[in-house]
Amino acid sequence: MRTQPVQIQDSIGRILCNPVFRSSGKKIFSKGHVMSEDDIRVLTGEGLNKIWVSQLDAGEMPEDQAVTSVATGIACGSLEIRVTSGGRANLIATEDCCLLIDDDLLKQINCTAAVVVATGVNFSHVKTGQRVATVKSAPFAVSSSQLETVTSLLRDRGPLLQARPIRKPTIGAVYADACNGDRARGQFEHVMKQRLERFGASPDYTVNCRETEFAIARSIQHLLRAKPTAILIASTVTPAGPEDAVGQAMARAGCQIERFLAPVEPGSLFLLGYKDDTPIISAPGCFRSAKPNVVDLILPPLLARYRVTGWEVACLGHGGLLA
């Protein structure tokens, strides 16, 4: 790309390097504006003779075209692309959803120097109309060879961002304590409703029971018949892992235990399992507080019907210190 001052009459089709103002201070054209014949008449009428312009060389792509190309390739799901002036494309959620980010691929793309991409946080919950990512290029033009590096990465690895919709999730809740579950319900019910409302969900099916392996297993099996999006187990006893009453009950109900312990504070004593495609969570004791904890990090992808793995739980440690 070449940048130089030229006579006004020689600027047709070239790109303004700087904004142009009237003597009164009012802007006539913005930086990045492509000059036309009508524009020349306007500037001549303002008494201007020369302006600084850029001209693309062979093998370069205009900035807006470049960011549109990258924005189209980096994402999938419930999104739309909105191109703004100055070589920027924003990705906007078209419905409530959960973001899934390939962090390694994002880093590779941001090392190409052709464009940069900024995204929301992996597993974050986003609302309709919220910006979830932005793509920005260097001013005016991008090298086609650098852009090809980016598109090649995307062809090989797939999109780096998914916006998985969260559509009418249903939740099953088990309240368990040493007696009949009433005390557990009293401690957890209000905050559970409050927490789920943040994600457009509610405890649709609830069961009270004693905290024994058999009683909790029966409660899980009962809730599974309703085919909820997820099941939360709230107990007055601090979780102790797969060998405690809740963990044994999950196994008895046919669950595969995916992960015990999360590198998140508060909420490290967290147990996740699956019965077929239904996630079942033994909530940590901090769940009774409305303050952010591990459940807030895990719920969005589960409500979007994404199967969170033990490895992905382990990766929550970076940024997992919530309080």
Residue ranges of each PLM-predicted region?
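Flexible, glycine/charged-enriched surface loops at secondary-structure junctions
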Residues: V53, L79-T84, V142-S144, S202-T206, ...
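Structural motif
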Residues: R14, N18, K27, N49-W52, ...
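Phosphate-binding glycine-rich loops and their immediate beta-loop-alpha structural context
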Residues: T128, P139-A230
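Short glycine/threonine-rich loop/turn motifs
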Residues: D204-A323
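Residue-level "contact hotspot" at macromolecular interaction interfaces
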Residues: I28, V34, N122-H125, P263
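Extended, charged alpha/beta regions that create polyanion-binding interfaces
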Residues: D57-I166
